């Protein structure tokens, strides 16, 4: 289970137990693979908290230090899973070779633009062994609010003050928070600061030893003048609004910030 409430998980457990079967929650000792290289993992307490931008910043910092960095992305398994067992992306042609979806491309292209290699696929032990051959450091770019597949040497977890309280009420996000070495409170430039303080207090309650950082998540728009005074139809990031349960995303914030006259309701 991923990005669901604790209550949801236990209702499912109750259904299973009532039928006489066991319900098991597997921990990191059972599910994480040990790398021969140092691993920095970037995960979150909810979908849409800002993992990808954080992962890319980590890659930028490590590259500036002269490290060979290879990223590994949490799986997005579409299409032929056998053919997608191990995927390596270093050039734009690789995206065509693996027939990547738009969702996959928006995750991989920023790494290619940085001249960084990113792996993904299905067999994550085979992926790791390939990545280790060309990396000084492996960066795990997590998905949803899942735990990292690789045993991290530094575990960074991103929290979202727009959903204050969710860091303690969603699975497996709370486990990520409790295991974190570094917690980043993201989006402080757009959040109510009372919610930032609430999140900070919750972090202190369950993981007082973690290093806590506050981060802005500034929006950039290629042609902001095209928005001002216009009626705008916003197409948001899907997961953030669906299982992420946000009422709005960066698109709405950008439209409002850059002077949209009206947000169009697309419903018939």
Describe each region flagged by the PLM:
Residues 1-7, 15, 31, 39-44, ...:
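Flexible phosphate-sensing "switch/lid" loops adjacent to ATP/NTP-binding sites
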């Amino acid at each position: 289970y991923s990005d669901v409430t604790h209550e949801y998980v236990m209702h499912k457990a109750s259904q299973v137990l009532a039928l006489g079967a066991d319900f098991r929650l597997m921990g990191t000792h059972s599910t994480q693979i040990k790398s021969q290289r140092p691993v920095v993992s970037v995960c979150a307490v909810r979908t849409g908290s800002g993992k990808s931008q954080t992962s890319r910043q980590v890659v930028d910092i490590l590259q500036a230090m002269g490290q060979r960095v290879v990223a590994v992305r949490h799986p997005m398994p579409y299409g032929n899973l056998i053919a997608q067992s191990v995927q390596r992306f270093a050039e734009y042609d690789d995206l065509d070779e693996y027939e990547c979806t738009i969702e996959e491309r928006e995750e991989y292209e920023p790494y290619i633009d940085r001249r960084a290699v990113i792996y993904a696929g299905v067999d994550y032990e085979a992926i790791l062994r390939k990545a280790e051959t060309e990396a000084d450091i492996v960066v795990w770019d997590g998905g949803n609010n899942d735990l990292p597949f690789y045993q991290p040497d530094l575990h960074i977890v991103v929290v979202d003050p727009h959903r204050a309280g969710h860091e303690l009420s969603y699975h497996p996000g709370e486990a990520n928070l409790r295991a974190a070495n570094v917690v980043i409170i993201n989006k402080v430039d757009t959040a109510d600061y009372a919610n930032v303080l609430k999140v900070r207090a919750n972090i202190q309650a369950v993981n007082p030893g973690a290093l806590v950082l506050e981060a802005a998540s500034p929006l950039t728009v290629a042609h902001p003048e095209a928005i001002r005074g216009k009626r705008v139809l916003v197409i948001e990031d899907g997961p953030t609004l669906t299982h992420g349960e946000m009422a709005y995303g960066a698109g709405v914030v950008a439209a409002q910030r850059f002077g949209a006259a009206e947000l169009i309701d697309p419903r018939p």
